[in-house]
Amino acid sequence: MIRHECGLFGIYDHDDAARLAYFGLYAQQHRGQESAGIVTVDKDGMHDHKSMGLVPDVFSEEVLRRLTGRTAIGHVRYSTTGSASQRNAQPFIAHFKGQDIALAHNGNIVNAAELRAELENEGAIFATGNDSEVFMHLLVRSLRHKDLPEAVAEACSRLKGAYCFLVLSGSTLVAVRDPYGFHPLALGRLDGSPVFASETCAFDLLEADYERAVEPGEMIVVDTLGEHSSRLPGPHPAKPRQCIFELVYFARPDSYVFNEQVYVCRKQMGWQLAHESTPDVDFIMPFPDSGVYSAVGFAQCAELPYEHAMIRNHYVGRTFIQPTQSMRNFGVRVKINPVRAMIEGKRICIVDDSIVRGTTMMTRVKKLRELGAKEVHIRISSPPVKFPCHYGVDFSSRGELIAAQCKMDEIVKRLDVDSLHYLSIDGLLRSVMHSDSFCLACFNGDYAVPCEGCAKFSLECKRS
């Protein structure tokens, strides 16, 4: 329903680096379904393959055999900056003074337009509309007088916004997370080799051990001398501002994100929601899959029957993964189908994780009405999304957001439901352990990194 920007994976010094990167990306396919790529490095240099499509469609056995080397980084992408085209697929590779540098990025750099203009005035040439390329230019410039870790740190000091980077060059792999820690990055261990991933579900698939989260503002350097951790230079915020939508929607429920168990958080959100507002209905039902875990918590707290009265077609991609509105509407129609026998004459409470634009909810409620539902009540396990996100989530203007454009009674009328209740911000924060460490800007407009005059970075190349 809502698109995220990407997922990262990296592994250092392992016999089967490319294949492990493949499965690490496969486990994080939910974070990006437009393109996928892997870069490996050996004594002969870098080897890469990237293309549009899902991980199993992009990589074959033949391709993986060609990606030789014991160190790899990988990327799955959804376009939040730059268009959905081959040239924007990552990882990026740059060549500088006989040195190859590969970059994979998760996030959104809010001052990228300003930095790009500065770089272009100094003669830089850009091939994509991607904010990640801005960082690559800064990195290469710093490499003129610094080694790779120092250059990464210097380049990061110019950035504002959200970023997790994996940077690979020769025998050095650098992992870095922005000082606010907007998006997750985890460190694990497989057969003694360090492994990095956006989500820990990648470690589970590989039977790697999860060690810890990469901390906000931390840079981890892995090279032939071992592993070294340091803090990025410059001032750091007193508290992180981690994206709570990772817990509400994006992350897989079997992942640990920001040192929180996603499954437990979502059940707690449902539990808190039921405490706030439980309608008189025959049963609780989720919209699979993202609403399932909140609905379980809601039903348990409310002591009401829980039914799977919506069946998902698992062979249809996420509604918002395709970038055109016509494809989005098609996805809404075919992705989920109600069980007719469960709907007619029933008073139903639908529990879902969020309403952003409202397109999906309107279509599904209409279908329930057509099948004879007596009452349809909606309970949402997050607060109303009223403000755009500048840090890498696909709602970049208030005009897209139904809660920003309509009052509650207007939303009820537009959705054609009998009642609607969103989880309060207080209820949301009671559902997590580290309640003072989250970005809530999409709910309350309190932006940690201002993006004045910028409805999210949009440097579309005219050639894209």
Language-model-derived ranges and their functions:
Residues 18, 80-81, 111, 182-183, ...:
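Flexible loop/turn segments at secondary-structure boundaries
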Residues 59, 128, 133, 306-317, ...:
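A conserved beta-strand->alpha-helix junction
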Residues 303-348, 362, 386-396:
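Short, glycine/charge-rich flexible loops or terminal/linker lids adjacent to PRPP-binding catalytic cores
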Residues 1-216, 221-281, 287, 375:
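Conserved short alpha-helical segments that host acidic/polar catalytic motifs at enzyme active sites
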Residues 124, 145, 278-281, 300-307, ...:
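Secondary-structure transition/capping motifs at alpha-helix termini
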Residues 284, 291-298, 302, 306, ...:
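Extended, hydrophobic alpha-helical segments in both membrane/secreted and soluble proteins
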Residues 156, 171-172, 189, 207-213, ...:
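PRPP-dependent phosphoribosyltransferase catalytic core
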Residues 137-146, 288, 300-318:
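Amphipathic alpha-helical
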